[in-house]
Amino acid sequence: MACTRRTKTLVSTCVILSGMTNILCLLYVGWITNYVNNNGNVKVAGRTHEKKFDVDSRGETLRIIERLDRLETVVNQHIQELPEKPLKDGEDTADQTLSDSLFAHWGHDLGPESRKVALKKFQYYGYNGYLSDRLSLDRAIPDLRPDGCRNISYPSSLPQVSIIFIFVNEALSVILRSVHSAIHRTPSHLLKEIILVDDNSNNAELSENLQRFVDETNQQRPDFIKVVRHNKQEGLIRSRVSGWRAATAPVVALFDAHVEFSVGWAEPILHRIKEDRTRVISPSFDNIKYDTFEIEEYPLSAQGFDWELWCRYLNPPKSWWTQKNQTAPIRSPALIGCFVVDREYFEEIGLLDEGMEVYGGENVELGIRVWLCGGSVEVMPCSRIAHIERAHKPYTEDLATHVRRNALRVAEVWMDEFKSHVYMAWNVPQQDSGIDIGDIREREALRERLRCKPFSWFLKNIYSEMRTYTETIAYGVLRNSLRPDLCLDQGPDSDNIPIMYICHGLTPQNVYYTSSQQLHVGGLSPTIDDDDNKCLVDVNGRPRLLECSYASNKHMKLSWLFTQGGSIQNRKSKRCLELVESADVDHGYQLALQQCSSQKWTITNILLGKVL
């Protein structure tokens, strides 16, 4: 799936090592269990509790989870400060991290050889392939639909669906469980065919053993399972289009090949599409834990995105809560990546953008395009599917590079004057970015042909929760002439004390200077429900990072006079932000507010048409 619930796992992919110019990528996984602790564990054996439907217009649960998610950046950049565990003989740091992740909640009774096999599979797949191979392909999973869903009846004349599974080097048992689940939990008169798209796997059993299963199934139901095999790896986006081209049913359902369907998943979606073929529908997702394969229930949510175009779960809109009907469709700004759509309408609306690379951003682009060009996007509470969220993605070494390129492509085609926000979020210049986004003329022509609305309409009418940053003048990393190898950094989030740190250009070092003379440090808060951005403030002569709205309401000293290549001076206190030598901190310099000297500051990028 093109998006995982990042609010549930903290996955650190980069450790910044002081004194080095390169980034050493490691894996550090921590499991956030606040939702489970508050609502009870959901086990595979069955549902252990009945949830009450509470009208929560503020969406406190989802906001708490999102706040935890924002700590990921700090973990990513400062994880090297944690004390190291002693390594076992013959074990390196990466092996230890993988072992800790896999065996924290599972496998305590395995012998040494079995642990080695399990760990090797975990490293290869990003989930517990060893355990998957030992689970039934037809295992029972809990029915986590809201209670009212079981009482809804649907017409018998619903359209048929082609289910498309995309995979590359997936565990065979996981693929087969996905297929078995689709067959046994989709009414036979509605399931026309299953299409398996193999994006050039090099795992032999996915050629021989999978084909044997397909042949045996097709002997009983001729041409029921089709296999599309790529001669070269095309990536998730083009693989989904390949699956669509092979489909023949009126409706297509595009899924990853590591899912399990809940009973009654198909009828609610097919009914909505029959009513209006311009609806693109996502089921509600639960989690298959990557280590234990237990099913974890997720709260009902819409699907949105931040300005980097990473998708994220959102609290359902207020209009949904006020209905007090937990079975009602949830209006959603975007899609997670697995979705169901009318086959012909999907072509009319432009399929997926095949000019994108590999993975990431295509789900956000589709949601934006559907809304702007006359369709709608919904999440169905009565349709639930469990999805494995990998501990790590083994099929690409540099996912962020692909997502960044794809995001800039989306921005240029669809976001009009707001495209600058995507460049700001990724900390790349609007001009001469050095990133080739490919030829976008065909997608621009599609937008014109479909007579799509401007992106401002989307922000006003569909994604009003999204924060905008039109006051920004300049952005990037902030360097001081005294030590140009160091950059202003937000430091440990709990301290609210900015620091100088070896420049790496990732989120903790993103700085934004606004027309109201504020200096925002750290990531851009995506929505109004998130914690506010942090602003640089003069607090009793000391530099501090405080929430901008709080500092403004308290009339604190958060306005700074700054010109490119000049000083940074607080308007009220007249003190300048400068570096002073200190033996007590890393890299020998700390920030101070003092009488202005000759120190100069520069920021990386100035927005087009702006003057600093």
PLM-predicted stretches and their roles:
Residues S464-L612:
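Lectin-like carbohydrate-binding module/patch detector with strong preference for beta-trefoil
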Residues M1-V75:
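N-terminal signal-anchor transmembrane helix specifying type II single-pass membrane topology
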Residues T13-C14, E50-D56, I64, L68-H184:
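N-proximal low-complexity "stem/linker" segments adjacent to membrane-targeting elements
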Residues I183-R229:
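Acidic donor-binding segment of Leloir-type glycosyltransferases
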Residues H230-A247:
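Glycine-rich, basic loop-to-helix element that forms the pyrophosphate-binding segment
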